[in-house]
Design a protein with these regions (language model features):
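Glycine-rich anion/phosphate-binding loops
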Residues: 47-59, 91-98, 231-239
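Catalytic beta/alpha-barrel core
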Residues: 91-92, 109-120, 129-142, 153-164, ...
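Catalytic alpha/beta core domains of metabolic enzymes, predominantly
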Residues: 151-256
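N-terminal amphipathic alpha-helix/helix-capping segment at the start of soluble metabolic enzymes
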Residues: 19-40, 291
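Alpha-helix-loop-beta-strand connector modules within alpha/beta enzyme cores
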Residues: 60-62, 88-111, 147-153, 203-212, ...
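Structural preference for beta-strand elements that scaffold enzyme active sites
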Residues: 37-41, 70-74, 110-112, 129-130, ...
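Glycine-rich, proline-tolerant flexible connector loops at the mouths of alpha/beta enzymes
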Residues: 44-53, 72-93, 256-268
Length: 291
């Protein structure tokens, strides 16, 4: 059947113009991206406090070390894309990057945080190893170029409204700044109102552009569906994560919390910290067979 959505060689045209500019494998501290070894990006959605963020970092670090998966810790200093103006956003750039810098120093972990404005990129880059472009902002040229100019690795989350092959343009914006250290994250596609679905074909499509990570927690989000905030279906996190690992992703992105019902952001789609170890053990077993 013909149609603009059909997966054909023509849909990979952006891959042909950008793939030579992207590193298919690169290091982020001790983590090798695109090496064939599955890696993990995990942490709370937002910095709720220094003590809480540090506690989560240390707990996730222990679990990752025990099961044998390389870890990049993540947390946000500002959630600028919340549904409501009344929602908690975080401590802000100055205090948030201070906290993330201390956690990176004390744990030895590489750290990821998201940036929302070009002016934030250089400041955040002084504290963290990976700058993340939020899905809602994945077409913002100035933001992508500014992130690329820092020299830090850049994780671009695919917008809920973007075709996977069109992410080649986002990749090219980062590489135009002379930075080949780019990877992409799938986090679901809008399917009607307040709902997301995951098209696993996108993982194969985007791997022609750059290394690919699957976000198993935001993919089960039901955006803006819970009275001024987002809901979620966390019971499907293991289902989608297993499928993504079997499909050959390079890494996994999981937001975890020790008390999801009381999390200050995205608790409805977070993975309970107690469930992280058994999930990772199962995913690593699948990866060993599938790779």
């Amino acid at each position: 059947m013909a149609g603009p959505w059909r997966l054909t060689p023509e849909t990979y045209s952006t891959a042909r113009c950008t793939i030579a500019l992207v590193s298919s494998s690169f290091e982020i501290g001790p983590v090798q991206v695109g090496s064939g070894r599955l890696f993990l990006i995990a942490g709370p959605c937002v910095i709720e406090s220094e003590a809480h963020t540090r506690s989560i970092a240390e707990a996730v670090q222990r679990i990752a070390a025990d099961v044998g998966i390389p870890l990049i810790f993540k947390a946000s200093y500002d959630k600028a894309n919340r549904t409501s103006v009344k929602s908690f956003r975080g401590p802000g750039l100055k205090e948030g990057t201070r906290i993330l810098g201390l956690i990176a120093k004390d744990t030895g972990l590489p750290v990821l945080t998201d940036v929302h404005e070009p002016a934030h990129c250089e400041v955040a880059a002084q504290a963290v190893d990976v700058l993340q472009i939020p899905a809602f902002l994945c077409r913002q040229t100035d933001l992508l170029v500014a992130a690329g100019k820092t020299g830090r690795a850049v994780n671009i989350k695919k917008g809920q409204f973007v075709a996977p092959w069109d992410m080649g343009h986002a990749v090219e914006k980062v590489t135009s700044a002379g930075n080949p250290r780019v990877f992409l994250t799938e986090r679901g596609f809008s399917f009607g109102y307040n709902n997301l679905v995951v098209d696993m074909r996108s993982l194969a499509v985007m791997r022609k552009l750059a290394p690919v990570v699957f976000d198993g927690t935001h993919s089960v989000q039901t955006p803006s569906s819970a009275g001024g905030k987002s809901g979620g279906q966390p019971e499907f996190i293991p289902v989608l994560a297993r499928a993504a690992v079997a499909a050959g992703v390079d890494g996994l992105f999981l937001e975890v919390h020790d008390d999801p019902p009381n999390a200050k952001s995205d608790g409805a789609n977070a993975l309970n910290l107690n469930d992280l170890r058994p999930l990772l053990e199962r995913l690593l077993a699948i990866h060993a067979v599938a790779s």
